[in-house]
Amino acid sequence: MEDLDALLSDLETTTSHMPRSGALKERPPEPLTSPLTQMGPGESSGASGDKDHLYSTVCKPRSPKPAAPATPPFSSSCGVLGTGLCELDRLLQELNATQFNITDEIMSQFPSSKETAGEQKEDQSEDKKRPSPPPSPSPVLPKPSATSATLELDRLMASLSDFRVQNHLPASGPTPPPVPSSMSEDTPSPPGPTSKGSLDTMLGLLQSDLSRRGVPTQAKGLCGSCNKPIAGQVVTALGRAWHPEHFVCGGCSTALGGSSFFEKDGAPFCPECYFERFSPRCGLCNQPIRHKMVTALGTHWHPEHFCCVSCGEPFGDEGFHEREGRPYCRRDFLQLFAPRCQGCQGPILDNYISALSALWHPDCFVCRECFAPFSGGSFFEHEGRPLCENHFHARRGSLCATCGLPVTGRCVSALGRRFHPDHFTCTFCLRPLTKGSFQERAGKPYCQPCFLKLFG
């Protein structure tokens, strides 16, 4: 396009120098008429000065007049003009070869209505400020006929003008007639598209533009919730596709697009709803278990809640003991529920002795008077207490009053005590008192002779 503008500028300069020849002064022909000079003030399309010059140079005049005989200086100018027109036709043929690419580029880069209106106002203000050059009396020469590329360019510019005018008007107003072009007599302008056609065209252009940019426009499947096609953002989960606003928690309807979720029976749930509805409950606090879990005694527990119900300490390597469905540590279980020793009343943990209808620690089953262990495994019982032989007879009064040993055979009962037969003697002469006669003084037995001698 820059080459075309430069060539048109050269042609304008060449045309401006033509009136200087003497032949033109004798018979000034009519000035060259362009389609833009015949249009009224209300029919101006708002195009720039370069575009006006392009139309006035390319378009075929309506009624060309025969030119006067050319003088030698004028024939040289005509040769220069013919060469320029040939160059213009060559450039237009190249433009015709790339018309489809130009059309796509123009349609994809439509300016907004505000920008177009601003450009038209600026162009009109510049045209008013710019002084109009005096018409140069140059002869009208026969020009080559417009080529097919020229016709195609006129049709494209007319369509573009129609589309811009339609965008400027409100949707409810009537559709204005298309702006006339320079080739309106040869090629009629296409009718303005309807609103539905314009919408379909714009949607098609948008879809093609997105496709060229690598953005997919086809449906990405049916939503797993509303069963409608998905276009745009999509969430893929549970083997299906979802609209982002439809992939929500099955309990509280919270959006789950960018957060973690749990699945139950094919439905997504947020962590709060999933744990509240489907997680096992702790046997102590009755709250849902979210992470680690201990299974014992037919129920589930938080690890920090599975502890001794008596002391509250967690169970170590020694494990736990159960009583009526409740866990206890070993120490508290034995302290609360283990059998008690009859001697020390402490819990029996290991070995024990069963005697006198009770359980005893081996170290606690001794004589309850002297705490001496029983030799030979035999013991004597008195009032439910185990005693050795001596303390048993002492409790029952069956010890010899002289030697202090138990009396197991024959005995002599005197003075409220028991004696071995050989140990019941006179306190002074130590003779046995076998005859059964004796005297007593201060709780001691005496024979008759010694009593008379001592106390006579």
UniProtKB/Swiss-Prot annotation:
Q: Mainly resides where? A: other
Identify the residue span(s) of motif LD motif 3: 152-163
Q: Where is this region: Interaction with PTK2B/PYK2?
A: 1-235
Kindly list the positions at which N-acetylmethionine occurs in this protein.
M1
Name the segments for region: Disordered. 1-79, 109-146, 166-200
Report residue spans for region: Transcription activation. Answer: 1-195
Q: Which domain of life is it from?
A: Eukaryota
Ranges of residues in domain LIM zinc-binding: 221-280, 281-338, 339-398, 399-456
Q: Tell me which residues bear Phosphoserine.
A: S63, S132, S136, S138, S159, S181, S189, S398
**Looking at the UniProt record for this protein, which Gene Ontology cellular component terms does it annotate, in alphabetical order?**
cytoskeleton; cytosol; focal adhesion; nuclear matrix
Q: Which residues carry this modification: Phosphothreonine?
A: T33, T402
**Sequence ranges of Basic and acidic residues compositional bias:** 116-130
**What does its PTM field state?**
Phosphorylated by gonadotropin-releasing hormone-activated SRC.
Motif LD motif 1, residue range(s) on this chain = 3-15
Where does this protein have compositionally biased stretches of type Pro residues?
A: 132-142
Give its localization: Cell junction, Focal adhesion; Nucleus matrix; Cytoplasm, Cytoskeleton
Q: Where is this region: Interaction with PTK2/FAK1?
A: 78-131
Q: Which protein family is it in?
A: Belongs to the paxillin family.
- Its protein name is Transforming growth factor beta-1-induced transcript 1 protein
Native species = Bos taurus
Its taxonomic placement starts with: Eukaryota, Metazoa, Chordata, Craniata, Vertebrata
